[in-house]
Amino acid sequence: NLVQFSYLIQCANTGKRASYHYADYGCYCGAGGSGTPVDELDRCCKIHDNCYGQAEKMGCYPKLTMYNYYCGTQSPTCDNKTGCQRYVCACDLEAAKCFARSPYNNKNYNIDTSKRCK
């Protein structure tokens, strides 16, 4: 679910950037999404949005699905055997790892999406 996703983000980036920094970034980080991603980090969000879309097609509710994960010393891992929990955790885990390895550009935070996301 979205709360667990927030924790996975913190785990993957070892607390270097608070999760809320990703809630209004570029064209895809946060609610909705359109146009061309502005950078690598925004592409992570587009991929995550698409992953959630696939989860919904499978009959899952990704924003609400609770799953099991472990925040280890190397990186977070998912601990779910089957179904929606496994799929949604994988979506969130891949996005969190993608966020951690992608540069954050302050100029792409809280942009005018009506102009830059066509």
UniProtKB/Swiss-Prot annotation:
GO terms for MF: calcium ion binding; calcium-dependent phospholipase A2 activity; phospholipid binding
Tissue-level expression: Expressed by the venom gland.
E.C. number: 3.1.1.4
Top-rank taxon: Eukaryota
Claim: Glycoprotein is one of the keywords in the record: no
Protein location: Secreted
Binding sites annotated in the UniProt record for Ca(2+): 28, 30, 32, 49
CC cofactor: Ca(2+)
Cofactor binding, note field: Binds 1 Ca(2+) ion.
Gene Ontology cellular component list: extracellular region
PROSITE patterns: PA2_ASP, PA2_HIS
Disulfide topology: 11-71, 27-117, 29-45, 44-98, 51-91, 60-84, 78-89
This protein's record includes keyword Mitochondrion: no
Xref: InterPro entries: PLipase_A2 (IPR001211), PLipase_A2_Asp_AS (IPR033112), PLipase_A2_dom (IPR016090), PLipase_A2_dom_sf (IPR036444), PLipase_A2_His_AS (IPR033113)
Family: Belongs to the phospholipase A2 family. Group I subfamily. D49 sub-subfamily.
Role according to the record: PLA2 catalyzes the calcium-dependent hydrolysis of the 2-acyl groups in 3-sn-phosphoglycerides.
Quaternary organization: Monomer.
Protein name: Basic phospholipase A2 4
Protein source organism: Laticauda semifasciata
Lineage: Eukaryota, Metazoa, Chordata, Craniata, Vertebrata
